[in-house]
Amino acid sequence: MDVDSDVNVSRLRDELHKVANEETDTATFNDDAPSGATCRICRGEATEDNPLFHPCKCRGSIKYMHESCLLEWVASKNIDISKPGADVKCDICHYPIQFKTIYAENMPEKIPFSLLLSKSILTFFEKARLALTIGLAAVLYIIGVPLVWNMFGKLYTMMLDGSSPYPGDFLKSLIYGYDQSATPELTTRAIFYQLLQNHSFTSLQFIMIVILHIALYFQYDMIVREDVFSKMVFHKIGPRLSPKDLKSRLKERFPMMDDRMVEYLAREMRAHDENRQEQGHDRLNMPAAAADNNNNVINPRNDNVPPQDPNDHRNFENLRHVDELDHDEATEEHENNDSDNSLPSGDDSSRILPGSSSDNEEDEEAEGQQQQQQPEEEADYRDHIEPNPIDMWANRRAQNEFDDLIAAQQNAINRPNAPVFIPPPAQNRAGNVDQDEQDFGAAVGVPPAQANPDDQGQGPLVINLKLKLLNVIAYFIIAVVFTAIYLAISYLFPTFIGFGLLKIYFGIFKVILRGLCHLYYLSGAHIAYNGLTKLVPKVDVAMSWISDHLIHDIIYLYNGYTENTMKHSIFIRALPALTTYLTSVSIVCASSNLVSRGYGRENGMSNPTRRLIFQILFALKCTFKVFTLFFIELAGFPILAGVMLDFSLFCPILASNSRMLWVPSICAIWPPFSLFVYWTIGTLYMYWFAKYIGMIRKNIIRPGVLFFIRSPEDPNIKILHDSLIHPMSIQLSRLCLSMFIYAIFIVLGFGFHTRIFFPFMLKSNLLSVPEAYKPTSIISWKFNTILLTLYFTKRILESSSYVKPLLERYWKTIFKLCSRKLRLSSFILGKDTPTERGHIVYRNLFYKYIAAKNAEWSNQELFTKPKTLEQAEELFGQVRDVHAYFVPDGVLMRVPSSDIVSRNYVQTMFVPVTKDDKLLKPLDLERIKERNKRAAGEFGYLDEQNTEYDQYYIVYVPPDFRLRYMTLLGLVWLFASILMLGVTFISQALINFVCSFGFLPVVKLLLGERNKVYVAWKELSDISYSYLNIYYVCVGSVCLSKIAKDILHFTEGQNTLDEHAVDENEVEEVEHDIPERDINNAPVNNINNVEEGQGIFMAIFNSIFDSMLVKYNLMVFIAIMIAVIRTMVSWVVLTDGILACYNYLTIRVFGNSSYTIGNSKWFKYDESLLFVVWIISSMVNFGTGYKSLKLFFRNRNTSKLNFLKTMALELFKQGFLHMVIYVLPIIILSLVFLRDVSTKQIIDISHGSRSFTLSLNESFPTWTRMQDIYFGLLIALESFTFFFQATVLFIQWFKSTVQNVKDEVYTKGRALENLPDES
């Protein structure tokens, strides 16, 4: 808040208190404030001079507030309550705060007419000026700027081409550009539609460019602020001071120091720096404990580090306490010692001996002139390079001073009635104020006048944009100039440069291609290819397909660019600029490596200018790298997943198996929208897949099985950090691997059923929608109906508290069954079953496949005394009564015990061990280190990983583990397919059965067999037996969600019986020492009783309607309904009312009329009037939508009944009531009029209204009395409506004007008052 606003607030508060004190009844307003009540702003109680008020609907401890506190809060929001009509709302209850206006004693009872008239005229002109300014600003900035952008783009394109699309017609070329359509006409409607298309395209382009710039800026800002970035810079260019420079700098700062001491200091600082670097390198290496004892890697630690000499450590600590080698040293001496302000001008020195105590150290000071000679660039970038020893000293001194300052300030605050602590003004050796000390003072709250006396009165930087007519035009001109310059920089120049680059690249590519062609023929490879095609004809077919589809398209684009025949293509137009940008990025990346070549941690770069250039280039390189990775992961992945879902699921179901994709066909009206559709589909799939993985991870499988899929709770997840330090190739390979896994799940999981199994193997259409119900456009009713049905079905299923526990029960059973059959219970579930630790060997095939149970019962010690395979074969020959033996196999293995283990720790896992946890084979740590070093890249040692959860379990792993694991994944896919297909077909069969045998007979009985509704429903029911019906599936799944309750209770009962049943043959399962999970969503205890009390439909209704999205959609629907009704009413009133009356009067008076609708002349020739009517109607509809939006935000948090009541009342007032008042009388008059007119006289009804058409019918020789009466009543009705509205508006205007004049001329002030209690 600036000084002027403080003065205004104080003056306003004093005036209001003065006015309030003059009122005799002010004190009575606060009699209801209870004792102990406090102000919610200052927490103070009420006094006689400063009472408490409750001016809003807040209750409880936040009910009351002081008037002075409220005025300060209002002033902080830049609201002037002294202005007429100023309104302040509470931030908590959003209710207007109650103020009482106090008028002057000499205010007359009636406002003088002259004053009222003058104020009204001034107010009218002021509002007209404001409306004109706002309208002009809206037109220029919202409409004009995008069109200017579009026209400059076309102008630059014509400059690059050297010709215009329509030679000789610059205006047409500027409006239409390079369009594929036929030669357009310069008519008003055609130009308007073209400008509308240009505006929509440019707006999308502008939004994407803004998003791109914001993303790049914030990523750049985050990167340079990341801690690891400064370490990466240090790794590339090292410290600014080499050992030689460090010695020379120490010698310059301490000229009295001998060479031996300088050598010692430089060596100690260098040793400490190397020690820090070695600690960083050790992060890549494996724990040293694993090298000493390969059997203990649970708690890794480094035991091989040699002990350090305590004297060396103490020497270096003494070194750290040496006074700073910069100007902060003088400030420290002045603050801590309270010595005189005189500073020595000569060269002072003190000798520091190794091992001396820090208490005996003497401060060293350097000359002020030497410090002034220090380069400014060196000071600017000191904080960016952490390991530099001198910078480390400076940072430590600055931190100590800051801590001392904070402590002193805190002590001063804690002492009662203590003066505010103000740091003394620090001066350097040259006598200048130290800016760092000023920053410290400002950081702890020192007033600006004390921190820097020269900066008094300077407030925050605010862009002062005043809304004036000339300013609007000036800002628009600035925007036009900026648009021209920006497009020239971002489009014109890069495209021009790209032309030359593409010529170079195409030339190089041609040379390489010709060389490859010559090599192909000279090496005789064409002979081998011809022989291969004769042996395998499919090779020739595949190469022909590649040539026709891929190579042909590439050649087509190449010819279109080189011959300039594809001027309308956006890709061809963007190719040169894109080439320039990619080349620039490559140059930046290469330049950063070139500038830093020859430098490193051992050999630092000392040139500050070169360091600055490298830091800029390196920051840009990192920004491009991170942006590419983020774009691939956030946009590329979802879009690619959406394309694969379209190929494997949506296209076969909603289109045809003969087609590849379906989404581009429904987005034909605007092809770029298909990318958004793909992104939405892919994002939703990835979200649901992540939820499925989370459910399995949390409730079913053992912790640590999915360690390769990072958990959201993983402390090692540092996205920006990992994106910076890991090589681009490694990260791209990980992304490709993730996308490959998604592709397997999508293409094989869905595409096998929709494109192979059902259409080809089963020859069935059960996974295909009937042709009549396939959506063809994204705006068609079929598509939107399917979309809404799927959305509400999802909401209903999620609202059921039985579906999720039932799904968890299903997958627990599946995983338990599959793991037991594959002997993976120990590895997957964490339950060690002894019977799975081997296999049973039978005497022969008869006992193995026919009499397996008898063979197992023949050995009473089958599992208690296992045998080897040789022992079993020997016993089969010796013991004839035993037909089966248990032979153990497999190994025990170390596996991660958590999903959030560190990456380096995982490298030591999955090794076989004995029962005593002894390694069967020593770890090859050197190979692991080398592999980690290759994978980590140049900055891998900077990767700091959390090792808190680095522990392991010992589990049993059977033979052929990989095959069994892949089989488990296949079984999971099989049972997921059974679940999805089973629910789909059961749901459709259920609803089809109910409709065929329940609803259809009733409809046939009520409506008859030939009724259209019955026939259509009967055809749909017949088709549903052989085709997929999405509506039946959705309704049936909702019904099954109700049945899920009974299924869940039945399975719980079965589980209870199974738990009490005793199986003599079952061997007890031994669970690992694994912590118990938190069982969320327990099936019995977590069941929502709302469904049992109110019924499932009320629960579903409550869950759906409580959604903010549903409320928003309801608001949009009501706004559209109101807009449609208001448009229809306006059209009827205009045509059947106003223009009909106008035509009747002009025909009766002048014998003809200016406007005709019956012959469609008004539509053909009077386009300007139609445009004006459309603009007025659009403004009215916009106002209606804005009112509905305000109503939605005002009531979005209310209950559903109040929200429905409010929106329905708004629809009634704005829609139906308006229609009844204005349209119903006209319709009644029209019906009465038509009773007296023969059918032959009613012509051209399709082009206009009946009454208006009949009024212009030339077949009427004379006007009948009924016609005169009709038009007379119509004129009377319209006149009455007009004068009634004018009267209402005049009364409202008069009351508002009188009140505004009172508030502006006679207002003495406004005082706070209590909110009246609701009775």
Swiss-Prot record:
The modification N-acetylmethionine is found at residue 1. It catalyses: S-ubiquitinyl-[E2 ubiquitin-conjugating enzyme]-L-cysteine + [acceptor protein]-L-lysine = [E2 ubiquitin-conjugating enzyme]-L-cysteine + N(6)-ubiquitinyl-[acceptor protein]-L-lysine. Residues 1-131, 225-468, 513-626, 682-739, 798-965, 1041-1113, 1190-1213, 1292-1319 are cytoplasmic. Zn(2+) 1 binds at residues 39, 42, 66, 69. It is found in: Endoplasmic reticulum membrane; Nucleus inner membrane. Pfam families: RINGv. Component of the DOA10 ubiquitin ligase complex which contains E3 ligase SSM4/DOA10 and CDC48-binding protein UBX2/SEL1. The DOA10 complex interacts with the heterotrimeric CDC48-NPL4-UFD1 ATPase complex which is recruited by UBX2/SEL1 via its interaction with CDC48. Interacts with its associated ubiquitin conjugating enzymes UBC6 and UBC7 with its membrane anchor CUE1. Interacts with PEX29. E3 ubiquitin-protein ligase which accepts ubiquitin specifically from endoplasmic reticulum-associated UBC6 and UBC7 E2 ligases, and transfers it to substrates promoting their degradation. Mediates the degradation of a broad range of substrates, including endoplasmic reticulum membrane proteins (ERQC), soluble nuclear proteins and soluble cytoplasmic proteins (CytoQC). Component of the DOA10 ubiquitin ligase complex, which is part of the ERAD-C pathway responsible for the rapid degradation of membrane proteins with misfolded cytoplasmic domains. This is ERAD-associated E3 ubiquitin-protein ligase DOA10. It comes from Saccharomyces cerevisiae (strain ATCC 204508 / S288c).
